[in-house]
């Protein structure tokens, strides 16, 4: 429920159930299959934990330096797009990918950015089936691990990988609404400073053509969670899921969709897109 005294312009903090992995010793495996890799099988044990989730939008409005990519692992940026239809692959390739490259360079200071994939998600099952979209993910996770971050560079840029891996690189994702504001199932992100190294549990990610790794998370009451209420189409959430530097800056940013208990009845299903990039410095 909302914190007492929430009014327009006040922080819309809330409590919601976030689904964490249970460290039972059972291997965590997430396997995708079928056309478009939209079906999945999952092994392992998970459980919901009630967590406070803080309104980052109001805090950032009061202090523009409150959130940054290197301090917290994420930041929200104003980002108008020329894309008319996010479900048109040509518009994504020819318009949106270059927009994302410019944005990631701006936010991170990277000298080179490579877009390597995107995922469209919908909370509407019929739309997912018709357009081969994926569902929102309701388990706390980080998309890359100490091993799978560098491995992704080797897979995508094999001729350059060993030279590129001699210097700093990061994997940075850009997430946004594709149509109406996000009302149902928004995205929550954990402040990277609130993580402990033993919170991270390796999960094997199996695709038809390769095997990767992600991190699932053990519950830790010290985790500090944030979200941006009602994200608009002209905003982009930029967050870091891997950084090769180990100097104290944010390296991993666990995140998850969640059910906002105050979502109004009849709220439109969420539609979102995330783009994944390699950023070299």
Descriptions of predicted regions:
Residues 2, 6-229, 266:
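Non-heme Fe(II) oxygenase catalytic core, chiefly the N-lobe of the double-stranded beta-helix
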Residues 213-281:
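Catalytic core of Fe(II)/2-oxoglutarate
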